[in-house]
Amino acid sequence: MKCKNYIFTLLVAFATLLSWWVVPSLVKKATDDSHSYPLMYYSSMLKELCIIDFRGGNETFSDAKGNVYPRSEYDSLLPLLNSRVLMMNGVMPDTIDGCAIEPKQLRVKQVSFRYRPSDMVAPQPQMGVLFEAMPKRGNLTMPGDFFRMEDDCITFVDAKTNTVDEKKSDRFTREMKKKGFAFPARAFWGNPTTRKPYEEGYFCLDANGQLFQLKMVNDRPFVKNTHVSDSVGVKWFVMNEAMDKRHYGFVFGTKGEAGILEENDGDYRFVKMDIRSFNPAEDELMVLGNILYWTVNVQNEKGLDSYGLNRETLERLSSYHIDAKKGLWDKTSEWLFPCYLSFTSPQSGY
């Protein structure tokens, strides 16, 4: 009898826990509305952030000060966003803010970048691909081997034979240690694809928190300490090969910093974006840059913060905040499900 009561208690407990997960999950799928926001873009003509929302048949757009403009002025007030249309119609300005407008420069100076929290919490590859940075025929090609970071060395493995290339591994390990790299590496970030304009290798965070650049030039190791860790504690890095080679990628710091790792006459420099404190575990980041200005959007479950930045200094010129609208799930879950189980993070999906 006691055994039956024990089993019955376990079944009730299991059913209760299961209902705390299944029922809320089904209700959330049926009622949850994903938070969507209008497109934000800094206008080089208005010198202000513009709110562009043509959803639902809306034919107007406005700026951050509340001024509303007709749809017919959309292209002319945002010439750097709609340059193709204006050039096709022959009405693109020759200069904006004293800067000559040339199609090639517009393309080269364009920056498009997006980061999501899932990028950081997703399983990271344990092996990397180091391309030749100065290929003889100009095109990036697969090197035929992969590397992995060990406790006290870097190891290159031949892709065909699955054997370790002892000479190459020793050559790169000795050079890394010579330049001050402390094993084991905490993390390493790169862009292992041939579909990129050029090769800058990998950026590796060593055991002391120093960020190093590692690449292969003429089949020889190139290792250099960026020293950006002297000014910012590196929490995460994302490679982003800019067309104009201005920066190597985006750096997220341990104290909420977000900015770019910039090329600086053969050295490196961290340029912080003048935005609110950024948490890569919770916040999304989108950057739309042109020849004069950057529009930076930071989004989380609380809302959207948008910034217009000077391209050269990344200093703030304008800012705007939009609160997240509560959907049906947000309104009902507070009282319908005061507590429930979830096996995924709302920020990352993992």
Regions from the language model: what does each represent?
Residues 22-50:
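Alpha-helical transmembrane signal-anchor/signal-peptide segments
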Residues 6-25:
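Hydrophobic membrane-insertion alpha-helices, especially the h-region
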Residues 50-51, 145-149, 201-207, 247-260, ...:
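Short beta-strand motif characteristic of blades in beta-propeller domains
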Residues 42-71:
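Short extracytoplasmic
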Residues 151-166, 209-215, 255-268, 299-319:
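Structural motif
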Residues 205, 294-341:
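Extended, hydrophilic extramembrane loops/domains of integral membrane proteins
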Residues 36-42, 72-112, 116-117, 124-143, ...:
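Repeated scaffold domains used in trafficking and secretory/extracellular systems
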Residues 164-177, 222-230, 262-263, 268-278, ...:
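Beta-propeller fold detector
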